[in-house]
Structures are given as structure tokens and as C-alpha cells.
Amino acid sequence: MTIKLIVGLANPGAEYAATRHNAGAWFVDLLAERLRAPLREEAKFFGYTSRVTLGGEDVRLLVPTTFMNLSGKAVAAMASFFRINPDEILVVHDELDLPPGVAKFKLGGGHGGHNGLKDIISKLGNNPNFHRLRIGIGHPGDKNKVVGFVLGKPPVSEQKLIDEAIDEAVRCTEMWFTDGLTKATNRLHAFKAQ
């Protein structure tokens, strides 16, 4: 099994660029930058895309330009065009249940209330069995404050932790392609930015 598509979830537009909900896009932006593979807008895939080589494998990158709750439209378009199965997709998203400075890989599972994941599961034919990379953003402590929280910008101290976790997650994703998922997972799950 190899990953053929890495998706970073986000809302489009400058007003959302620095918000917690866009942590997935921050990851893909950094990965594309590291691999010198600039993202370009591609209308037929409803997003910014690039093509990279990881561990000798051809991998597509995608940051949807749809709103978060329509992310599945972009993912399904690209998966269908390149004949990519759900278990060959890695979706990178912000995670309320992990603190800033932590990131974790996961295969399958529910959407945990995340509207981007919810739409992707739906558009992939109700198939939740894709890989996820969960970027911790913390929780506001009150479920009624979640929307404002994910659409807010983290303070500098939290942003630093999130950025460090993303940096480590990029390294571990590259390691996945060279040394396998188990080794990459063990390293990433032991990491906590201070």
C-alpha cells in the first residue's frame, strides 16, 4: 500500500489563511515547499495541486479551494481522475482532541464532527478508510465555542507549537515512504513540541 494523494484541508481566501481550521493546508504548503513543487490552481480538481516524488513514488498534493464542508468534491474529483483508492489517500486536518505541538497518524474512523472529513467520507461513497494526519490545535473547553475557535487565529505561542508539529509531521511523512508507516508513526507519536 502506498499513498498516492495527500490532501490538506482548509477554507479558501485570505481571511481564513491563518485560522486553525487551515492547519492541513499549512502542512501541504510546507511539504510542497520542501520538495520544491509549487502548488498551482487546477479548476477540474477544485483546488491547488502539485505532483511530487516521495520514496520513488508518484504522489499528488491537493489543497481544495472549496469551503471546508465541500472538501469531498475536490478529493473525489482527483481520486476518480487518477484512479486512487480511499486507502491510498492521506487527509491532513486540524484536530481539536490533540493539543498544539502534537500530530498523529490514523487510519479510518469517524469524522469526529469535522465537516471536511464528513464530506470526504460521504463523497468517497461513505468510505471512511482513508489515512489521516491529525494536527493538534487544542480545544476551547466548551463545545459551543468550537466554531469560533477553529475559525480563529492561534496566539503566537500556540502557532509556534503547531508549526513545530507540522515540521516534524512533514519529516515523518517522508519517512513513511522510505522506512514504512510503523517507523514513521512511532517517531511522530513520540513527538511533542515544547
Swiss-Prot record:
GO terms for biological process: protein quality control for misfolded or incompletely synthesized proteins; rescue of stalled ribosome. The active site is at H21. The record marks N11 as: Discriminates between blocked and unblocked aminoacyl-tRNA. Its main location: cytoplasm. GO terms for cellular component: cytoplasm. InterPro entries: Pept_tRNA_hydro, Pept_tRNA_hydro_CS, Pept_tRNA_hydro_sf. It is found in: Cytoplasm. SUPFAM superfamilies: Peptidyl-tRNA hydrolase-like (SSF53178). Pfam families: Pept_tRNA_hydro. The record marks D94 as: Stabilizes the basic form of H active site to accept a proton. It comes from the Bacteria. TRNA binds at Y16, F67, N69, N115. Its EC number is 3.1.1.29. GO terms for molecular function: peptidyl-tRNA hydrolase activity; tRNA binding. Hydrolyzes ribosome-free peptidyl-tRNAs (with 1 or more amino acids incorporated), which drop off the ribosome during protein synthesis, or as a result of ribosome stalling. Belongs to the PTH family. Monomer. This is Peptidyl-tRNA hydrolase. The gene is pth.
